Amino acid sequence: LKKTPAVDIALHDPVDADAAHTSSESTSLKNEEIVGFDHIVPELRKKLTKGSQQLDVISIVGMGGQGKATLANKLFNDDSVKSRFDIRAQCCVSQEYSCRSILLAILRDLSCDDPAASELSTEDLRDKLQKMWKVKRYLILIDDIWEASVWEDLQPCFADVNNGSRIILTTRQVEVANSARISCEPFHLPMFKEDESWKLLKEKVFGNEGCSPDLEKVGLEIAKKCAGLPLSIVLVVGILAKGKNEQCWRQVAKNLGSHIQSDAEAMIEN
């Protein structure tokens, strides 16, 4: 797996952490925009737009809350990437997998919700897509594949007509990425280091303001408990920004445990 340092990833619009555990807030956290990846995007963009004319799969591997889907969508919507492909579509697999549902989602994304598509069988959907692949250079984003068997089931649906088509795939499982590999090595998203987590927390809480040494000491402890996950950092930014005092921060540090990571992952899964 290819690895790269985690640097300069910034979060926009920190959420109100007081309501972070409601379903509506969970949705907003799940969709929280994480921007940056400035050192990563150019390399992956090149894999999408340059190189062999053979169909290739660019797999992005990482834990829940690490920013896989955000990076994939950033690439998918990149102007230079969009201009390279004739047609584009995206879908999310999730744990309840259905080949027909995935193919239907892709076709609907390509055909502007053609109502007739819902009546097609799996075989008809596959055939309809195969006809598109033969005349169009395509880019497909498949988010959140959990098992290699799912990719093995989907793979025959994507024709290689040697026209530079690409598939972006996100997964938590190295096995899935290895199974999907054609030419490009799977890309392994790095975890934040503690100092990077603190840098991000400090930036989002204080902006251009300074941070006292006492708060920095507690802040480093909080950053450590975020376990290197951007989404975990989002969960605490709102609280820290509301109470910029040592007492409040120590209370957060005291109550913040390993559950923060499972909370972040649960929001990704729901």
Listing of model-derived features with the role each one plays in the protein:
Residues 1-270:
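Intracellular innate-immunity NLR/STAND receptor architecture
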